[in-house]
Amino acid sequence: MDPYKVIIRPLVTEKAVSLIERENKLTFIVDRRATKQDIKRAVEEMFNVKVAKVNTLVTMKGEKKAYVKLKPEYDASEIAARLGLF
């Protein structure tokens, strides 16, 4: 799957911001058909980082949400700043 079609948008909520600061995790709304491997590949390619782990869930609205944990040598707050989240 094309990386630019996998990630629909970053999610900016109070919980998402606290995850960036505390756990080095980014939160995205992604395509429902995307697998964890697709999401990992897309984030690594788009932001030039290494991903440690991806957790996904489908919300009550029917959107797929992905929590992407970055490896310790990368900073989620730096990526969030590049995206304009802060």
UniProtKB/Swiss-Prot annotation:
It holds the Pfam family Ribosomal_L23. GO terms for cellular component: cytosolic large ribosomal subunit. The keyword Ribosomal protein applies. The keyword Phosphoprotein does not apply. One of its GO terms (biological process) is translation. Binds to 23S rRNA. One of the proteins that surrounds the polypeptide exit tunnel on the outside of the ribosome. Part of the 50S ribosomal subunit. Contacts protein L29. Belongs to the universal ribosomal protein uL23 family. This is Large ribosomal subunit protein uL23. The lineage of its organism: Archaea, Methanobacteriati, Methanobacteriota, Thermococci, Thermococcales.
